[in-house]
A protein has these predicted regions:
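Bacterial N-terminal signal peptides
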Residues: 8-19
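Acidic-aromatic substrate-binding/catalytic surfaces of carbohydrate-active enzymes
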Residues: 25-84, 91, 214-228, 278
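Beta-strand-rich recognition/accessory modules
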Residues: 55-60, 70-73, 82-84, 115-116, ...
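Polysaccharide-binding surfaces and accessory modules of carbohydrate-active proteins
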Residues: 107-174
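Active-site mouth of glycoside hydrolases
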Residues: 251-256, 260-262, 266-536
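Catalytic-core region of carbohydrate-active enzymes that cleave or remodel glycosidic bonds
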Residues: 499-516, 528-724
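C-terminal beta-strand-rich structural cap/linker in extracellular carbohydrate-active enzymes
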Residues: 787, 857-875
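Proteolytic processing hotspots in large secreted/extracellular or virion-associated proteins
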Residues: 795-834
C-alpha cells in the first residue's frame, strides 16, 4: 500500500539517491504525515503535536471524514481533506521555505452557510513536562498564533498565521493546549486563504517526514511475502529438545530474583501470547501444527490470553449472548484450552495462565450492586440484559472477589483429559496471573472517586480511605484522591494488597504450586504502583512503544525498554507478559517494527529479566480464511517474524552477557509515594540501564507493614536521587559495561557484538558497519541484520550460520495478506570457515542455493534490491 504512486520516476530516482537522514539535533521539527501538520520532538519524544479539531453545535465532534497527505518532492507536500458535517474542503501546499521555517498555504472552500457551530481549526498540544524548561506557550497578539520558549536563549518555536484567525486561545481546562480556529460560531460560504509559518530557532532541526527518511519507493512493487504461516522458516526446536515434555524438571518456582525449576535448573522463558479467537476457533490439527511451529521459532512459553473477554465469542464461558451467567465454564471451550496445553507441553513449551482478563459479569451472577457497574455498550446476555465490567470494583466488592475465586476453582481444578492432570497440578503451567491490567494505584482507583454518582462501591471506597487515614494519622481529604501522589498512593497500595493476598491465599489453598502474579504495572504507571505487586512471586510489566525506539535520547526521553527496566524490584524475578510496538493506526503498522525484537531480547538478557512474552502471536483463528494483518498477529507478519527467532537465540542461549554492575534506585518512603517517579520524568531510570543493571529497592513504610524493605545487593551502586544522570550531558550513545551492546540514539543505531550473535539494527543505510566478524554496507535506509551461530561455535568457526534480515513490510488494502516486503539492497560480508554454501527457502519451504562468493576468508552476499528473503542459511 502506498500514498506515493503518482510520484514521477525521475523524482523517485532523486529521492532514492538521497542519503538516509539521521538527526543532528535533539530538537526536531517535521510534518506529521497523519495530519499534514507540524510536530516537534525532543530526544525522540513528542514535545508538541498538532491535530485538526472541528466541532458542530454544543461541541459535538465534526472532524474530517476523508483526507490525503502526499510528499510531492523533498520538503514539499500537499494536503487535501473534506469535512462533510460542516460543509467545507481544505487544501494546503506545504514547503520548507528557509532552513528555519516551514510554510502552510491553506485554502478553505465552504460550500454553504453554517450557523450555531462551535467551529474549529488546529489544536496544538504541548508536553507539560517541558514547561519548567520552556515555559508555557504564549499567544501572539491579535489572534495571529503562538510562541514557545525563549527567543533570546533558545530553543524557540513560533506558529504565525496571516491574516489573523477568528480565534486563538489557550484551552481553559488544559493550559498545555492552544487552539487556533479557522471558523468560529458560523461558517460563511466562500473561500478563505490562510498562511501559516512555523519558525524555529537555531538548535532545532527541520527534518524530513518518516516516509522521506525511509525512501519514497513504490511499495506496491515490493515482492509478496513467501512465508508459510503453518510451518516455520527456521528450526530452533533444538532449544526445547531437552525439555520435552514441558514440566519434566518439576514446578517452576521463584528463588530470590530468579526463576528455577524444582530440580534447581535456572528457568528463562522467551514467550508469546496466543489469544482470543485463536484459542477457541482453531482446529485441533492446526493447534498441534502451531505448537510445533512455535517451538521451531524458538519459543518456550505461551500465555493463553483473552480466554474470558467479553468481545471474544465463544469465550471460556461460551457465547455471551447464549448464557445467563459466568458461573460455569463451557465444556467445548475447555476442550480447546486442554488441547493447547497438551500440544504445547509435548513441544517443550510451558504455559502461562490468566485467571481474569476482561470478563463481563451478568445480572444472574448475583453480584451485589450489579446495577452500578459500568456496562459494555451494545452487548447483552441471553436474557438481553446488559453485561458489566469488574475492573477496580473487585477491590471493594466481596461478591466480585468471590466469583473470581469460584472461577479459579473451576479453571485450575479442571482435569485435562489429555494430560490426566488438573491445571493446578501440571508442572507445564509456569505461572498464574490473578487479574490483567487491573491496578488501583495508577488506573482503576479513579473509578471509585466521589465525583461519580454516589454508589455503594464509592461509599465503601470512601469509608476504607477514611479508616486508613485515621489508622495511620494521614490527612483524610488527601487519602481518597486517587489521581494525586501522597497519602492516596499508600492507601491504594494497601487496598490492592488486601485483595491480592486474599486471592493468593485462596489459590495456595486450592493447591497452586507455581509462581502467582497479582496484576501488572502498565500504562505509564510510576514506581508507586510497585509495592502492591510484591504480594505476588513475580513483578510483571507491560510496555508498548511507537516508531523510533532506538532514537529515544535517555537524557531527555523514555522508550519502551525503560518502562520494563523500571519494574525490576530487588530480590524479585521480572516477567513481561506483553511487549510490542503500537500500530500508527488501525490499518498502518509501525514501519520499523523489525528493530524491536533483538533490542528487547538483548536488553532483557543484559538486565537479567526472567520471562518475556511478545504480544501477540495471534488473536485470530489459524485458518486460511482468517489471515489478516494486525499488530496482534506476528505469526504472519514478516516484519515482526523476521527477527523473533534471532531474538530467541540471543535471550535463551545467553549470547549477551548480564551486566557486571548493578545500579539500585533506593527512594525513601516519602520520595516513592509523594511524587511521580517513572521513566517519563526520571533521568536516572533511563540512563542507569544503559550503563548496567537497573533495580528498584522498596523502602520500609510504616503505613504498609506488609511491605518488606528490599535487601540491597552488596556490590550495587545505590542512588537515591531520581534526577541524577549517569551519562554525560552531551552523550549521543551508550555502551554496555560488557562492551557487547551499543546504542547511538543520534544515529538511530543499535549493535550486538558477541561471539555467537552479531547484529546491526536501525538506520544502517549509507554507512559501512563492521562488527567482530561481519561487515555491512546497505543502501536500504533502515533494516535489521543478524548473523548467528547455530552450532554453538563462534561465528568464524561455525559451520552452521543463520542470517536474519528485517525490513519494512506493508499489508495490502483492507489489512489483507500476504504482506509486501521491502527488498534489501547492499552487501553483507562474513568471516567464516571455507566450504560453506548459502541457502534460502522458496515458497514451498524447500532450501535452494543463494549466490555467494568467498575470498580472503570472507563470504560476500549481495542483496539486489529486487528480491527478498528474511532468512538465509550459511552451512
Amino acid at each position: 500500500m502506498t500514498r506515493h504512486c503518482l510520484v514521477s520516476s525521475l523524482l523517485l530516482t532523486l529521492l532514492l539517491a538521497l542519503p538516509p537522514v539521521t538527526h543532528a539535533e535533539d530538537w526536531v521539527a517535521s510534518i506529521d504525515e497523519s495530519q499534514g501538520l507540524p510536530q516537534l520532538t525532543r530526544g525522540g519524544n513528542l514535545a508538541m503535536q498538532a491535530k485538526f479539531k472541528f466541532f458542530a453545535a454544543d461541541w459535538k465532534w465534526a472532524n474530517f471524514d476523508s483526507g490525503a497527505f502526499k510528499v510531492e518532492a523533498p520538503f514539499t507536500y500537499s494536503l487535501r481533506a473534506r469535512n462533510s458535517t460542516l460543509g467545507f474542503d481544505l487544501k494546503a501546499q506545504i514547503a520548507k521555505t528557509t532552513e528555519q521555517s516551514l510554510t502552510w498555504a491553506f485554502d478553505l472552500q465552504a460550500h454553504s452557510r453554517k450557523t450555531n457551530v462551535m467551529g474549529g481549526g488546529i489544536s496544538f498540544q504541548f508536553d507539560r513536562a517541558l514547561f519548567t524548561e520552556m515555559g508555557k506557550p504564549n499567544l501572539l497578539p491579535g489572534n495571529r498564533g503562538w510562541s514557545w520558549g525563549d527567543r533570546a536563549k533558545g530553543p524557540y518555536i513560533e506558529m504565525r498565521f496571516d491574516p489573523p484567525l477568528t480565534s486563538v486561545y489557550i484551552e481553559p481546562i488544559d493550559d498545555a493546549e492552544v487552539r487556533a480556529f479557522f471558523y468560529k460560531d458560523q461558517i460563511a460560504p466562500g473561500t478563505q486563504q490562510i498562511k501559516g509559518v512555523l519558525t524555529v530557532s537555531q538548535g532545532i532541526e527541520l527534518a524530513q517526514t518518516s516516509d522521506e527518511r525511509f525512501g519514497l519507493g513504490d511499495t506496491s512493487r515490493w515482492p509478496l511475502d513467501q512465508t508459510d504461516w503453518r510451518t516455520s522458516p527456521v528450526d530452533l526446536s533444538f532449544l526445547n529438545a531437552g525439555e520435552k515434555p514441558a514440566g519434566k524438571r518439576g514446578f517452576v518456582k521463584a528463588v530470590g530474583d530468579q526463576l528455577q525449576f524444582a530440580d534447581g535448573t535456572p528457568a528463562r522463558f522467551w514467550g508469546t501470547n496466543v489469544s482470543a479467537y485463536a484459542l477457541f476457533k482453531t482446529s485441533d490439527d492446526e493447534i498441534r501444527a502451531q505448537a510445533k511451529r512455535l517451538s521451531a521459532l524458538g519459543f518456550n512459553l505461551v500465555r493463553l490470553h483473552h480466554h474470558d473477554s467479553y468481545w471474544v465469542t465463544p469465550s471460556i464461558f461460551g457465547r455471551h449472548d447464549q448464557v445467563r451467567d459466568t458461573q460455569n465454564l463451557s465444556p467445548e471451550s475447555l476442550q480447546k484450552i486442554d488441547w493447547w496445553i497438551k500440544c504445547l507441553k509435548d513441544e517443550g513449551i510451558y504455559v502461562w495462565l490468566d485467571l481474569h482478563v476482561q470478563r463481563a459479569l451478568m445480572a444472574r451472577d448475583k453480584i451485589r450492586g450489579f446495577d452500578e457497574l459500568p456496562k459494555r455498550e451494545g452487548l447483552t446476555d441471553r436474557d438481553k440484559q446488559p453485561i458489566a465490567d469488574l475492573k477496580g470494583y473487585n477491590y471493594v466488592n466481596d461478591t466480585i472477589a468471590q466469583t473470581m475465586k469460584h472461577f479459579a476453582e473451576q479453571y485450575l481444578g479442571h482435569v485435562n483429559p489429555y494430560t490426566s492432570l488438573a491445571y493446578k497440578d501440571d508442572p507445564a503451567i509456569a505461572a498464574v496471573l490473578i487479574t490483567n491490567e487491573n491496578d488501583l494505584t495508577g488506573h482503576y482507583g479513579n473509578a471509585l472517586l466521589p465525583d461519580k454518582t454516589p454508589t455503594q462501591h464509592i461509599k465503601r471506597y470512601m469509608a476504607l480511605a477514611e479508616a486508613f487515614a485515621k489508622q495511620h494519622g494521614l490527612a483524610k481529604e488527601q487519602t481518597w484522591r486517587a489521581w494525586e501522589h501522597g497519602p492516596s498512593k499508600l492507601f491504594l497500595n494497601d487496598l490492592e494488597q488486601r485483595f491480592d493476598q486474599q486471592m493468593i491465599d485462596h489459590l495456595r489453598a486450592l493447591g497452586v504450586k507455581v509462581p502467582i502474579v497479582t496484576t501488572s504495572t502498565w500504562g505509564r504507571n510510576g514506581l508507586s504502583a510497585l509495592p502492591a505487586l510484591t504480594s505476588g512471586d513475580l513483578i510483571d510489566v507491560h510496555s508498548y512503544g511507537g516508531a523510533g525506539q532506538l532514537e529515544k535520547n535517555p537524557l531527555t526521553s523514555d522508550n519502551l525498554v525503560n518502562w520494563l527496566a523500571a519494574a525490576q524490584v530487588v530480590g524479585r524475578p521480572l516477567s513481561v507478559t506483553e511487549w510490542n510496538n503500537e500500530w500508527q493506526s488501525d490499518t498502518q503498522p509501525v514501519a520499523d517494527r523489525y528493530t524491536l525484537a533483538l533490542y528487547v531480547a538483548a536488553t532483557a538478557r543484559y538486565q537479567g529479566w526472567d520471562a518475556l512474552m511478545h504480544y501477540a502471536y495471534s488473536q485470530e483463528p489459524f485458518r486460511e480464511e482468517d489471515r489478516s494483518a494486525s499488530n496482534w498477529h506476528a505469526y504472519n507478519d514478516p516484519s515482526q517474524l523476521a527477527t523473533l527467532p534471532a531474538a530467541a537465540l540471543v535471550y535463551r542461549r545467553g549470547d549477551v552477557r548480564e551486566a557486571g554492575q548493578s545500579y539500585v534506585f533506593a527512594p525513601t518512603s516519602d520520595t516513592l509515594f509523594n511524587q511521580s517517579i517513572s521513566p517519563a520524568d526520571s533521568v536516572l531510570l533511563r540512563t542507569a540501564m544503559e550503563k548496567g543493571k537497573l533495580q528498584i529497592a522498596l523502602p520500609k513504610t510504616p503505613a504498609l507493614p506488609w511491605l518488606q524493605a528490599s535487601a540491597l545487593p552488596a556490590a550495587a551502586k545505590v542512588i537515591q536521587d531520581p534526577n541524577q544522570s549517569l551519562l554525560p550531558a552531551n552523550a549521543s550513545e551508550a555502551r554496555s559495561d560488557t562492551g557487547e551492546l551499543r546504542r547511538n540514539w543520534q544515529q538511530g543505531l543499535y549493535t550486538i557484538d558477541t561471539p555467537l550473535t552479531q547484529a546491526a539494527i536501525g538506520w544502517l543505510g549509507g554507512k559501512t558497519l563492521a562488527l567482530g566478524d561481519i561487515q555491512l554496507k546497505l543502501k536500504t535506509a533502515s533494516a535489521s541484520v543478524a548473523v548467528q551461530s547455530l552450532d554453538g561455535k563462534p561465528l568464524k568457526q561455525s559451520r552452521n550460520l543463520l542470517i536474519s534480515l528485517g525490513t519494512r513490510a506493508e499489508p495490502q488494502p483492507n489489512k489483507r495478506t500476504p504482506f509486501r516486503v521491502e527488498p534489501l539492497d547492499g552487501t553483507l560480508s562474513i568471516q567464516a570457515v571455507d566450504g560453506l554454501k548459502l541457502f534460502s527457502r522458496n515458497a514451498q519451504g524447500q532450501l535452494q542455493e543463494y549466490p555467494v562468493s568467498y575470498q580472503d576468508g570472507r563470504y560476500l552476499i549481495r542483496f539486489d534490491g529486487r528480491q527478498m528473503t528474511n532468512w538465509l542459511f550459511l552451512k
